[in-house]
Amino acid sequence: MKNPVFTGAGVAIITPMYEDGSINFDELGRIIEDQIAHHTDAIIICGTTGECSTMPDEEQLAAIKYTVDVVNHRVPVIAGAGSNDTDHGCALAAKSAECGADALLMVTPYYNKTTQAGLVAHFTAMAEAGGIPVIMYNVPSRTGLNIAPETALELSKHPLINGIKEASGNISQVAKIAQLCGDELNIYSGNDDQVVPLLALGGKGVISVVSNVKPELVHNCCKAFFDGDTAKARQLQLEMLPLADALFCEVNPIPVKYAMNVLGWEAGECRLPLVEPSEAHKEYIEKALRAEGLITE
C-alpha cells in the first residue's frame, strides 16, 4: 500500500502575472495564503493551469521554490515537472525535487507520442531522476496519448510512482485502473465534474481548477464523502457543475484567470498563444460566479 501524497482537494493554482508577462510573486503568495485559509489540501504549482508550457526552466523552478517557501510544510506542494523530452524531464524533475517539492506531477509525452512501452520507460526514468513521489497525469484530450490501465498497473509497481491524475473523462477506464492497481496507485480526479464518481471508485481526491475560485466548495465536497455523508458530497458535486462548465468554456486556464481577475485578484492575462476569453464567454463566466455568490454586482 502506498500512502497518498494528499487526500482531498488540491488546487491546480494559477500563476499570476504582471502586464509585462513576468510572474507576480507577491500575488501568488497572497493566493496561496487564501487557499490554505480555505482548507485546500495541497498546492499544485506549474501545472497546466499554472501555464508551465510557456515557462523556461529557471522561471518554473523559481515558482516552485517560492511556493515551497510560502507553504512551509503546511500542506503538500506538488510541482509540475512533465516534458515530452525524457532527458529534459529528468533534469527538471531532479531540480524540482531540490527545490523542496513533496511530489511531482508528470504529464504524458505530447506531440511525439510514444507507445505504452515508451510510457513505462519515460515515467520510470523521470521518477528515478526526481527521487520523490510521482503523480502521473493522464489527459489525452491535450496530449493525444492515453495511459492504458495495464500500463498504469505496470508503473504502479515502481515504489516512487504514487498516483495518477485521471483527466481522460472515462469513468470505465478509471474503474479498471482501480481494479488492477488497488492501493498501489492513488487515483485523483483531473475533472471537477467527476470528483464524487472517482472518490466512489476509491480515489483519494481531486486536482482542481474550481478550487482557484471557491476552494472551500471543493474541499467540503471531498470531506463530506470521506466522512460518509455521500448525500452532502453529491449535493456539493452538483453545485460545482456550473462553475466547472464556466471555467472550461475555453481552454484552461483562460477562463479561470479571467474569473480570478473578476474576483479582485491580480491574476493578469495568460501568455500567448492564449488570449482573453470572448465577450460572450466573459458574460458566461461572470454569470456563474454571480450564481455561486462570489460576486454581487
Functional labels for PLM-detected ranges:
Residues 5-16, 34, 38-40, 200-203, ...:
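C-terminal alpha-helical cap/extension of soluble enzyme domains
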